[in-house]
UniProtKB/Swiss-Prot annotation:
Its main location: cytoplasm. This is Importin subunit alpha-1a. It comes from Oryza sativa subsp. japonica (Rice). The lineage of its organism: Eukaryota, Viridiplantae, Streptophyta, Embryophyta, Tracheophyta. One of its GO terms (cellular component) is perinuclear region of cytoplasm. GO terms for biological process: NLS-bearing protein import into nucleus.
Length: 526
């Protein structure tokens, strides 16, 4: 449904803020998912292959030759796996595990083709022989770390429910390897993730996360938990909600890996409707998330910021929770420090959702000293950051009071908003036009109150070369932008421009013309 320009400001605020089945809310989250994909190194890996203890050593040039030699002994290894002798079974399974653990290009396909996967799955059930269970689980973990087809082989042989059962094993090593395997399966795709969850993996996984858990298990279990929460379409929130209390504890860890994966899990769980956001808030995570906005490692800071940003897409009360925990000074530091582009972009996005709130929330942003640095980014930053800063300023003009909007102008927002009117992004042009229109309304009110004949802000826009740009937008291909430009010119410049423009007819799309002559300036459609 297309909206008249006059309707867009309020609809944009409501949709962008509440984000319930909202076009704008979805746009933000989709953009951010692209950002996640682009910065995969900042996020945990979808799958992890467990390498051997010697993996830290340099790989000799002859490594490939060694693999070929081992593949030559495959028939003997297969024989050992299928023998009835426990020692031969363990020795052969360990050889396969080592083969699958080499650092570069492990021969996963060749191992699958050798037909040993169903036997490894059988070995998972050998409670009498935990060492064999462990080696088989490790081998299957590494097979599942491969392609989706490789993972499917592990699933199709019935390994998932057995791995879930192994989360209750008396062997620490077996439990940890089962956690890792389930993380690899869940990380393959939303379909595989849902299969793992449907097999009841979440609660026994959460049981691994207690004060006695060793660090390697803590890291693996938190990573697997993040894979359980990740992906689009999202898992059922009722299935993943039980993870919230554990995540609320994990974000107090001192370990960077645990912190990173716990914050990513929270970012996935908070990405959605207000009921999800409320559940995340009620888990008590907000104070710690705000603290983590100042974490020295970007790998922790980015998912913490993403989660805070998701929370402020909620309603005003949910946004206030973040403000009350002193997030604004942290966001200010993210804008002003020499941090990477993606962090500044996310910080501006977060602020734009706060300025889409009520007047008190806009005032909190002003009081935090954020507007000046925001305007500076709007003027000087890369385009991706400018776009988010434009939303933040425009939202503030939409919901701000008369005095708040005058403050935005005093901080220099007019010139950079005018400069963006020639950018190629249609949505940003519209956002800037809306911001300028809201500023002009305040100037008009001031003009009336002072019984004067000059709208000071229209003069400032003219001096910033904004008037010329708005006039040029009358020939824009996008009808919505054309209509908005005409509306602004008609409301704020027509009287002043009558003499200079005379009866000039400005070309307009779709057969419309706009005449600034004596006829009063109605658009005529022919």
């Amino acid at each position: 449904m297309s909206l008249r320009p006059s309707e867009r400001v309020e609809v944009r605020r409501n949709r962008y803020k509440v984000a319930v089945d909202a076009e704008e809310g979805r746009r933000r989250r989709e953009d951010n998912m692209v950002e996640i994909r682009k910065s995969r190194r900042e996020e945990s890996l979808l799958k992890k292959r467990r390498e051997g203890l010697q993996a830290q050593a340099p790989v000799p040039a002859s490594a490939a030759t060694g693999v070929d030699k081992k593949l030559e002994s495959l028939p003997a290894m297969i024989g050992g796996v299928y023998s009835d002798d426990n020692n031969l079974q363990l020795e052969a399974t360990t050889q396969f595990r080592k083969l699958l653990s080499i650092e570069r290009s492990p021969p996963i396909e060749e191992v699958i083709q050798s037909g040993v996967v169903p036997r490894f799955v059988q070995f998972l059930t050998r409670e009498d022989f935990p060492q064999l269970q462990f080696e088989a689980a490790w081998a299957l973990t590494n097979i599942a770390s491969g392609t989706s087809e490789n993972t499917k082989v592990v699933i199709d042989h019935g390994a998932v429910p057995i791995f879930v059962k192994l989360l209750g094993s008396s062997s620490d090593d077996v439990r940890e390897q089962a956690v890792w395997a389930l993380g690899n399966v869940a990380g393959d795709s939303p379909k595989c993730r849902d299969l793992v969850l449907a097999n009841g993996a979440l609660l026994p996984l959460l049981a691994q996360l207690n004060e006695h858990t060793k660090l390697s298990m803590l890291r693996n279990a938190t990573w697997t938990l993040s894979n359980f929460c990740r992906g689009k379409p999202q898992p059922s929130f009722e299935q993943t909600r039980p993870a919230l209390p554990a995540l609320a504890r994990l974000i107090h860890s001192n370990d960077e890996e645990v912190l990173t994966d716990a914050c990513w899990a929270l970012s996935y769980l908070s990405d959605g409707t207000n009921d999800k956001i409320q559940a995340v808030i009620e888990a008590g995570v907000c104070p710690r998330l705000v603290e983590l906005l100042l974490h020295p490692s970007p790998s922790v800071l980015i998912p913490a910021l993403r989660t805070v940003g998701n929370i402020v897409t909620g309603d005003d009360a949910q946004t206030q929770c973040i403000i009350d925990h002193q997030a604004l000074p942290c966001l200010l530091s993210l804008l002003t420090q020499n941090l990477k582009k993606s962090i500044k972009k996310e910080a501006c996005w977060t602020i734009s959702n706060i300025t889409a709130g009520n007047k008190d929330q806009i005032q909190a942003v002003i009081n935090a000293g954020i507007i000046g640095p925001l305007v500076n980014l709007l003027q000087t930053a890369e385009f991706d950051i400018k776009k988010e800063a434009a939303w933040a300023i425009s939202n503030a003009t939409s919901g701000g009071s008369h005095d708040q909007i005058k403050y935005l102008v005093s901080e220099g927002c007019i010139k950079p908003l005018c400069d963006l009117l020639i950018c190629p992004d249609i949505r940003i042009v519209t956002v800037c036009l809306e911001g300028l229109e809201n500023i002009l309304k305040v100037g008009e009110t001031d003009k009336t109150l002072a019984a004067g004949d000059v709208n000071v802000f229209s003069q400032m826009i003219d001096e910033a070369e904004g008037l010329e740009k708005i006039e040029n937008l009358q020939s824009h291909d996008n009808n919505e932008i054309y209509e908005k430009a005409v509306k602004i010119l008609e409301a704020y410049w027509m009287d002043e421009e009558d003499d200079t423009m005379g009866a000039t007819t400005v070309a307009a799309p779709q057969g419309a013309t706009f005449d600034f002559g004596q006829g009063g300036g109605a658009a005529q459609f022919k």
